[in-house]
Amino acid sequence: MFSFYFNDNKITKLLMVGYGSTGKSVCDFLANFIDITVDISQNDDEFVNYDLGSYDLITVSPGIPLNKSPYRVLTKFKDKIVSDIDIFYQYIKDTKAKTIAVTGSNGKSTVVTMTDFVLKDLGYKSILVGNIGTPALNKIGEKFDYCVVEVSSFQIDLFNCVRFDLGCIINVSPDHLDRYQNFEQYKQSKLNLAKFSNDFFVYDVHNNGIKYAGEYQIIRGAIYRNSTKLLDIAETKLFGEHNLENIIVVLNILDRLGLDINQAIDSIKKFKGLEHRCKIVKKVNGTTYINDSKGTNVGATIAALNSITNSKNIILLLGGVAKGGDFSLMIKSLDKYVKYVYIYGADKEYIESYIKGYCKYQLCNNMKQAFELASQKANSNEIVLLSPACASFDEFSGYAQRGEVFQNLVAQLEQKS
């Protein structure tokens, strides 16, 4: 066994703040080293008892709110704070592996998953880590050609010395305003990814015209490279113009990696998309039920509404924990595509205050009641869409469980029909 070094400095004492999946991955990794003491702070009461200045390094889990007491004090020790991805980078930086980091409010999970899928389909060894669910350090012993990393703004705030070969920001819209003072601060957190990337591009920041599309453009539901048609959405297993936008981001990533785009197009045609992201569950009694439980902010729900239909035939299930979201931003899409809204969850009155007077709606006790009322109201050729624009932890363990419950409710409805 060896001692643990970070930036060529021997680390003998480390404090871990937070012990979720990320914290556990750090702890498991450090178990491979000797001469290091690791203290773990798992809650507020424990944290205040530690002398932060006595530690060589402090690792902080992304879920720890640095803007709230008692954790604000951590900002005074910025030079000691590292993320799990910084540690991961220290141990792969001298290999030939390429690292790609993607952040954004909406679409980043689709982009990183599609990128990883294409790389593997082209015959490369690729790993997918980060905010998508697998901590980077869990993959430290594997050999790979490419490492695709989904990063959140919370993770970027913790970065110390990581250097990605390529960084990319997509689709930044208001989110996590319970954690940031305003949208500008949140957007800047995302843009800070550039400081940790050797190459970098931005594809759309809140429709402010900051968009690098390279040689690609969308014309009538298809992607063109200059004047050559590459791909029609109908040739894929995806739907909606937002997925064409996601594909353009992936193509630009692959371009910058120097890979063959024509071969990549064949791989993209096989990609099935993500669970709980604009997935058709079933058609029951002529009504189509769509699961977009991964739509956890206003921007994601707007993207779903704008992509699913050209008619005013959506019955929308909306609600959960709003995270300070600005629901007035969806009024235009509600007016154009939504027949009725069922609002549920912890912040239903908050959501109501934004959309009252702009659409027909009803408040519900929970998602199950919202579903039951929606299925009763829906007619043939209409759509019941779960795209909550909210986090799920008031009622569920996460967006995946919320989506699974929705799918089960659809299955039960089909059995009764």
From Swiss-Prot:
The record's keywords, sorted A to Z, are: ATP-binding, Cell cycle, Cell division, Cell shape, Cell wall biogenesis/degradation, Cytoplasm, Ligase, Nucleotide-binding, Peptidoglycan synthesis
Q: Which reaction does it catalyse?
A: UDP-N-acetyl-alpha-D-muramoyl-L-alanine + D-glutamate + ATP = UDP-N-acetyl-alpha-D-muramoyl-L-alanyl-D-glutamate + ADP + phosphate + H(+)
Question: Which SUPFAM superfamilies has this protein been placed in?
Answer: MurD-like peptide ligases, catalytic domain, MurD-like peptide ligases, peptide-binding domain
Cellular component, GO annotation: cytoplasm
Q: What is its main location?
A: cytoplasm
**Superkingdom, taxonomy of origin:** Bacteria
Output the InterPro entries linked to this UniProt entry. Mur-like_cat_sf, Mur_ligase_C, Mur_ligase_C_dom_sf, Mur_ligase_cen, MurD
Kind of enzyme, top EC level?
Answer: ligase
Gene Ontology BP terms: cell division; cell wall organization; peptidoglycan biosynthetic process; regulation of cell shape
Binding-site positions, ATP: 104-110
What GO molecular functions are on record for this protein?
ATP binding; UDP-N-acetylmuramoylalanine-D-glutamate ligase activity
**What metabolic or biological pathway is this protein involved in?**
Cell wall biogenesis; peptidoglycan biosynthesis
Compartments (UniProt record): Cytoplasm
Instruction: State the EC number(s).
Output: 6.3.2.9
| Family statement drawn from the similarity comment of this UniProt entry | Belongs to the MurCDEF family.
Task: Write down the NCBIfam families for this protein, in alphabetical order.
Answer: murD
Describe the function of this protein: Cell wall formation. Catalyzes the addition of glutamate to the nucleotide precursor UDP-N-acetylmuramoyl-L-alanine (UMA).
List the HAMAP family hit by this protein, alphabetically: MurD (MF_00639)
Question: Any idea what this protein is called?
Answer: UDP-N-acetylmuramoylalanine--D-glutamate ligase
